Curated annotation (Swiss-Prot):
Function: Could be involved in insertion of integral membrane proteins into the membrane.
Annotated family: Belongs to the UPF0161 family.
Signal peptide interval: none
UniProt keyword terms in alphabetical order: Cell membrane, Membrane
Annotated region (Disordered), positions in chain: 61-80
Upper lineage: Bacteria, Bacillati, Bacillota, Bacilli, Lactobacillales
Record Pfam families: YidD (PF01809)
Organism the protein comes from: Streptococcus pneumoniae (strain 70585)
Protein name: Putative membrane protein insertion efficiency factor
Length: 80
């Protein structure tokens, strides 16, 4: 199941992301964050990854935002 959820992210990383300049504001890129979140939390990791993508904009804080050990849609406090 996790491999099926990760496959579209890998496709994005391999074929779509290289076409655009790097724009992620976080140390762990949003696509890598989603992969780690899916590996840790299964389908809930997809929701965490989508929430992370919504946090990644020019007015957000930058820096580290690691995947938390527990399910949360908020930024990891360790990252602030």
């Amino acid at each position: 199941m996790k491999r099926i959820l990760i496959a579209p992210v890998r496709f994005y990383q391999r074929f779509i992301s290289p076409v655009f300049p790097p724009s992620c504001r976080f140390d762990l890129t949003c696509s890598n964050y989603m992969i780690q979140a899916i590996e840790k939390h299964g389908f809930k990791g997809v929701l965490m990854g989508l929430a992370r993508i919504l946090r990644c904009h020019p007015w957000s804080k930058t820096g580290k935002d690691p995947v938390p050990d527990h399910f949360s849609l908020k930024r990891n406090q360790e990252g602030e």
